[in-house]
């Protein structure tokens, strides 16, 4: 039934239609849900699962990540004479801005094991968060980071502190859990991660390419080099692998958005992983992702310079290239905008 109101002259008038509610930005929803998921997993990890890192490391990692992100954004705003992206929307704007740093910090802390030394973890968090400001490329007309922040921080730490630290041991993710609870943990992680990637980040094709490529490389290594098939495939059954698949490699800010490109990206990581394994290089998951992201960034820079040279050769009547400085002065927004990272990515 249509509601009416009585006008002053006695005529019936229809009230103005209600304002349609603006739909929430899916990128913000992805960041928020990733942050909630990784925070909850940290809490459960220290209380129920058996995480062996000191629980204060998570707090220190968050403080380090927040401080690094705010410092670099303040410096960038001063250098390019613009307002810092975390200002302008009050506490809500600051909260949205810090979501990527929150995800990245917790992911680095969760996946690195440095015994009782926090400094390597702190170094990894600083490298991860600062990489979004340092390692950038002209992507679709604006400067954006191309290295997966959490993955890069972990990879650099494993290279610099190879004698001190390692990846968190796989048993840590279910050490205190009972037999049936251990079966429940990967199901929950797999279900929640799949829902996030299917509905918000739209990275299902990437997961298919990565999982399919990983499965194929195990069979290829078995047939050609005699690698034990059950050993090569057993990696896919671990909780750490599921976390990596759903929360790190699918980082929206550093992975392709088109399904075909996503599939190629995921398959490429699996291929590089197989090469690293045959070269007896450990921590292949993280190094493979860093290598593929680095080549993707070099590809963007190569495409930019080729177009620039073509534009210069075309003369005044040719196509006009955007000045790099102008592109750099318009960075992607971090809160609900383009500077999406999880762990940035959300990563765990």
Where are these regions (language model features)?
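C-terminal ends of transmembrane helices
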Residues: 68-89, 128-143, 190-202, 245-255
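N-terminal signal-anchor module of multipass membrane proteins
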Residues: 2-81, 85-86
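Membrane-embedded alpha-helical segments in integral membrane proteins
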Residues: 16-18, 34-52, 69-70, 103-112, ...
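C-terminal transmembrane helix-loop-helix hairpin of multi-pass membrane proteins
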Residues: 20-37, 217-325
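Membrane-interface helix-loop-helix junctions at boundaries between adjacent transmembrane segments
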Residues: 83-178
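Structural signature of hydrophobic alpha-helical transmembrane segments
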Residues: 53-64, 114-126, 171-186, 229-240
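Internal active-site segments that recognize and position negatively charged phosphoryl groups
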Residues: 161-216
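Alpha-helical transmembrane segments in multi-pass membrane proteins
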Residues: 37, 57-69, 73, 100-108, ...
């Amino acid at each position: 039934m249509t509601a009416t109101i009585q006008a002053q002259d006695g005529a019936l008038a229809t009230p103005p239609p209600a304002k349609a509610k603006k739909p929430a930005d899916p990128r913000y929803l992805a960041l928020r849900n990733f942050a909630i998921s990784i925070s909850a997993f940290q809490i459960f990890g220290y209380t129920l699962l058996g995480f062996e890192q000191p629980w204060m490391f998570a707090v220190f990692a968050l403080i380090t990540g927040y401080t690094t992100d705010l410092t670099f954004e303040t410096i960038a705003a001063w250098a390019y004479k613009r307002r810092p992206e975390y200002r302008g929307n009050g506490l809500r704007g600051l909260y949205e801005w810090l979501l990527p740093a929150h995800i990245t910090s917790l992911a680095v802390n969760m996946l690195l094991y440095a015994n009782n030394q926090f400094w390597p973890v702190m170094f990894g968090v600083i490298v991860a968060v600062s990489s979004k400001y340092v390692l950038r490329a002209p992507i679709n007309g604006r400067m954006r980071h191309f290295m997966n922040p959490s993955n890069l921080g972990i990879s650099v730490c494993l290279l610099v502190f190879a004698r001190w630290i390692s990846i968190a041991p796989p048993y840590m993710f279910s050490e205190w859990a009972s037999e049936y609870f251990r079966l429940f943990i990967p199901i929950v992680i797999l279900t929640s991660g799949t829902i996030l990637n299917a509905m918000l980040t739209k990275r299902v094709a990437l997961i298919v390419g990565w999982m399919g490529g990983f499965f194929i490389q195990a069979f290829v290594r078995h047939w050609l080099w005699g690698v034990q098939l059950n050993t090569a495939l057993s990696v896919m059954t671990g909780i750490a692998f599921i976390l990596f698949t759903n929360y790190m490699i699918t980082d929206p800010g550093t992975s392709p958005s088109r399904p075909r490109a996503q599939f190629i990206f995921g398959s490429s990581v699996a291929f590089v992983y197989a090469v690293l394994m045959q070269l007896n290089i450990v921590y292949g998951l993280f190094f493979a992702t860093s290598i593929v992201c680095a080549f993707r960034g070099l590809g963007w820079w190569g495409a930019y310079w080729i177009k620039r040279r073509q534009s210069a050769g075309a003369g005044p009547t040719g196509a006009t290239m955007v000045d790099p400085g102008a592109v750099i002065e318009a960075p992607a927004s971090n809160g609900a905008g383009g500077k999406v990272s999880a762990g940035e990515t959300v990563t765990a």
